[in-house]
Amino acid sequence: MTQATSIGSWLVLMAVMGVVSPLFSIGGNAMVADLIPNHQRAQAYALLRTAINLGVVTGPLIGGWIIAEHSFQTAFWTAASLLLLLAGLAHWFLQETRPELKKDTPQSKQSVWKDRHFITILLFYTFSVMGLIEMFILMPIYLEQNFQILENQSSLLFSVNALIVVLFQYSTTRWASRFSPFLMMAVGALIYALALGSIPFLETFVFFIVAMMVLTIGEMVINPTVTSYVSNLAPDHMRARYMGMLEMVYRVAMGTSPLVAGLINDLVAPSWIWVYGSLITLVGAAGFISLYLGRFGKN
């Protein structure tokens, strides 16, 4: 990034980053599932999310200090050096955790796409994430264009989100683990819908922060629950494939939801962005409720 001087070079870098960045979450989530018993996985994924968001809170602060005292180039070189160091530590100290594949397991003939239950969960989760993505991608633009709240102020929303996750993710997940996973997925999606649906009625920055806090509660409920459920659902030797498909939900949502919302902004009205986001998350919530009722009926 220190050598990127044009839009074209940045596009190439972003494309490479888009391919490489999911590898950590896929491998990390699969490794957690290999190491942790089923009944403790939700808490383990909560701790993993806490660590990631701790980096989200502290990284920009450290990076901003380096930029202020030195330069952008120094900040990028420092980040690259730390990542190389971490890659080396992971290579030398982390051991393979994937269970050995039994000889009679028809690995080559198995396909993630044939697991209809899993694909159904992915579909409903995609609807939920499509609403979530709006808050992180479109909110700064919405605030600047309609309320003259600049990016250096709106970035506080994301710091609040990360800080709440650091402080409350583990305790929230322990509470949510007492209930049906499908029920908690539905609750998380409904909280998304509530937060997004409130935004057209807000006019002051303090209330936008409150909306982000509400959204974060939904995020803390649904994300570890889905990840834990999928890790339990996946066969041992196909865990990384299932986690890869789960990670793809975010890529699909990031590629589609801002595009649809942008068209709504241009053709209808800016406030209808959030109506769309709320409705799409309600579709996800309805799907999870149907799964919960179906499982409840069987039990």
Q: What is each PLM-predicted segment?
A:
Residues 1-5, 191-203:
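C-terminal ends and interior cores of transmembrane alpha-helices
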Residues 8-13, 121, 206-211:
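Short hydrophobic/alpha-helical segments at membrane-entry points of transmembrane helices
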Residues 15-52:
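Cytoplasmic helix-loop-helix junction between adjacent transmembrane helices
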Residues 82-99, 287-292:
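C-terminal membrane-cytosol helix-exit motif in multi-pass small-molecule transporters
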Residues 95-123:
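Juxtamembrane intracellular "pre-TM" segments in multi-pass secondary transporters
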Residues 137-153:
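Short amphipathic helix-loop junctions that connect adjacent transmembrane helices
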Residues 168-180, 265:
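Helix-to-loop junctions at the C-terminal end of transmembrane segments
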Residues 240-266:
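A late C-terminal transmembrane helix in Major Facilitator Superfamily
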